[in-house]
């Protein structure tokens, strides 16, 4: 009788493979980005210097500057007009709305609660800026494109179902839980 080597094991993408773990890491990292930028808006502090490490986040004032610039430069007149005539004049409200929306996106992604919806929310926040600045050529591989690609992936993949609350919600609601 001859011994045969065991058959190689195959892994499926749906199992807890390296891909699932990488999506989980991407979800958590992107959630931290949104959460920290939301906190920068809440506390109106964008620059941090820890001595050995310094960095900047987007405060409400910086966000208003980015939107003002994008709305002025865009070739999409209705989108620019929306920001110039509605959002920017009402920045006292919209600045806080942005902070709370980023906070919701950050918490959703970080904890994996309705993670696909959170990713779509992030796309809704960042997408218009990228679209308004598309023709300038300045932001193709910089902010906000560096946030768009991960958000697109996270809107497609159910990354919150591994090491996230979406997993428990799927167990409870089954196919009725779409995130």
Residue ranges and their predicted role:
Residues 1-104, 111-179:
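Extended, low-polarity transmembrane helix blocks
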